[in-house]
């Protein structure tokens, strides 16, 4: 069973609402062109409609630290589809899966600050077929330090469950995603990969 986590892991230090606005001031052009959203997916097409959700604080900002772990929740798909992830100057294509899962990536080096996008690579395309999940990686305002510490610790706990299954309801509640419960099965397999060094 998934180890107990607070029902709301952000209750320790709730991120203040102005956080995203502060991030926008630090890099106004890029974040204005690319608004943050933790969930991706469309409403049409078997592939494009697949749910993709980042495990990041509710404000969409994540400082992954010196040993980055990135987490993505994938919904069910009628066809096996690879998962595309890209950030700063790097891009990864994870193996195709059909069923819903929790994917975790342990990276070999710190990630350069910038946007992180994830989406299903439909028919081998490397451009999003629908709005992607989009978060901002890198150090944020000092007020977000506690939330990022909780996020990193929770990702490490999840990494310790690689190859097992986790309770979906508990996972979603911990990451403020309870509204997605009806789109996912009761448990999710934890699929872990350690990409080879490349780019960021």
What is each PLM-predicted segment?
Residues 103-105:
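Short strand-edge motifs at loop-to-beta-strand transitions and within beta-strands
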Residues 15-35, 46, 54-57, 74-75, ...:
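Extended, polar beta-sheet/loop recognition surfaces of beta-rich domains
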Residues 154-200:
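Preference for solvent-exposed, low-hydrophobicity sequence contexts
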Residues 76-85:
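Solvent-exposed loop/turn segments flanking beta-strands in beta-repeat/beta-sandwich domains
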Residues 107-115:
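Surface-exposed, short loops/turns at beta-strand junctions within beta-sandwich domains
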Residues 1-15:
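Gram-negative bacterial Sec-dependent N-terminal signal peptides
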Residues 60-77:
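Contiguous beta-strand segments within globular domains
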Residues 89-101:
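Solvent-exposed serine/threonine-rich low-complexity stretches and specific carbohydrate-binding patches
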């Amino acid at each position: 069973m998934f180890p107990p986590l607070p029902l709301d892991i952000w209750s320790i230090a709730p991120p203040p609402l102005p956080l995203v606005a502060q991030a926008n001031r630090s890099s106004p052009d890029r974040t204005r062109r690319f608004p943050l959203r933790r969930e991706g997916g469309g409403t049409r097409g078997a592939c494009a409609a697949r749910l993709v959700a980042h495990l990041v604080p509710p404000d969409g900002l994540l400082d992954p630290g010196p040993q980055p772990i990135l987490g993505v929740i994938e919904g069910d798909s009628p066809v096996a589809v690879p998962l595309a992830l890209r950030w700063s100057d790097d891009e990864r294509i994870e193996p195709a899966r059909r069923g819903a899962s929790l994917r975790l990536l342990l990276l070999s080096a710190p990630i350069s600050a910038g946007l992180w996008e994830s989406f299903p690579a439909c028919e081998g395309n490397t451009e999003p077929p629908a709005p992607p999940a989009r978060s901002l990686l890198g150090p944020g305002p000092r007020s977000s330090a506690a939330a990022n510490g909780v996020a990193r610790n929770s990702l490490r706990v999840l990494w310790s469950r690689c190859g097992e299954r986790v309770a979906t309801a508990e996972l979603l509640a911990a990451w403020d995603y309870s509204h997605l419960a009806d789109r996912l099965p009761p448990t999710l397999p934890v699929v872990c990969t350690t990409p080879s060094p490349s780019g960021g």
